[in-house]
């Protein structure tokens, strides 16, 4: 332990990471640097600075940074270029935030001369893997302190007792038993885990949802959006250009208004267990549908199918924490290359929990009306050619059937 003189802690200002801060001081006798990232969680972050100061952190060792634009531009948008979904439903809202936090922690460790980094992820979840794979990929020699795998504070009561003994300010909600759910939020989504959600037979309570109205209570009038795309990324809504963070914020607002993006999911964690979570991803749900819409007229068929084949692998890499791996980076180069001609606009309809594409157009379109028409195409397509195409593709099946008959 003596070789660790300074450690950078991913710090939220909440009970868990405040206890970790004090525990690091007590058990490692190390100078603690706190890093708090604004990635759109919607919380006031200055209280984290105040609490860190109360716990003896030097002002120059407190880092609070607005990373919302970088988060959407460099992490969310690249992921959505691949139409990424984990296990058919999950849009990876938590998974995609961890690589950015890990990256910035390592940068701060280099800048401050820290020998170690620390996080508040438990020993049961995926986040410990995501953080630490990122740390080691970006700084191979870094030391990692994961308190939940070291200490004996394995219950809420023990955490509260430690906090009280150490003089850590305790919010009233923790004294009264804590929040009903374990929640994680950023610009892409908000997640809910724990408490009665740990019983997969129990339906989520109606008052749990924060960002979306129920589809039944959504407006009776549908709303239409024209979303403009450049190189696979959304850049404007109804003619108004928006920054990446502004884009996702506005789509969240519009999607939430129409009850879009709710998900109740049992997923397979990388560490081996099944876990239930509920998610609200209104803006991401709209982006996924719209992106598929613009790709439908701008991507070559085989390129589109190749992307579909690779997507589950790409999604698993992100979910499991391999954002900074060579294979994810290689896949990203391919994905980004496919997006060069993904330009144009998509019209989507928002109505009572659903989002559907109703129109799309592009200067790069591969949709040829003269060939696709059911009317006279003026010779653009010779239907007689289809006969030879079919016979050649049927050849192997005809040979197989003839062989079967000969064998009796």
From Swiss-Prot:
InterPro entries linked: Arginosuc_syn_C (IPR048268), Arginosuc_syn_N (IPR048267), Arginosuc_synth (IPR001518), Arginosuc_synth_CS (IPR018223), Arginosuc_synth_type_1_subfam (IPR023434), AS_cat/multimer_dom_body (IPR024074), Rossmann-like_a/b/a_fold (IPR014729)
Pathway: Amino-acid biosynthesis; L-arginine biosynthesis; L-arginine from L-ornithine and carbamoyl phosphate: step 2/3
Keyword NADP: no
Record localization: Cytoplasm
Known EC number: 6.3.4.5
Binding residues annotated for L-citrulline, in chain numbering: 90, 95, 126, 130, 182, 191, 267, 279
GO cellular component: cytoplasm
Pfam families registered for this protein in UniProt: Arginosuc_syn_C, Arginosuc_synth
Location, primary (coarse class): cytoplasm
Keywords (A to Z) from UniProt: Amino-acid biosynthesis, Arginine biosynthesis, ATP-binding, Cytoplasm, Ligase, Nucleotide-binding
Chain positions recorded as L-aspartate binding sites: 122, 126-127
Binding residue positions for ATP: 10-18, 37, 120
GO biological process assignments: argininosuccinate metabolic process; L-arginine biosynthetic process; urea cycle
Catalytic activity: L-citrulline + L-aspartate + ATP = 2-(N(omega)-L-arginino)succinate + AMP + diphosphate + H(+)
Xref: PROSITE patterns: ARGININOSUCCIN_SYN_1, ARGININOSUCCIN_SYN_2
GO molecular function, one term: ATP binding
Subunit structure of this chain's protein: Homotetramer.
PANTHER family assigned: ARGININOSUCCINATE SYNTHASE (PTHR11587:SF2)
Family: Belongs to the argininosuccinate synthase family. Type 1 subfamily.
Protein name according to UniProt: Argininosuccinate synthase
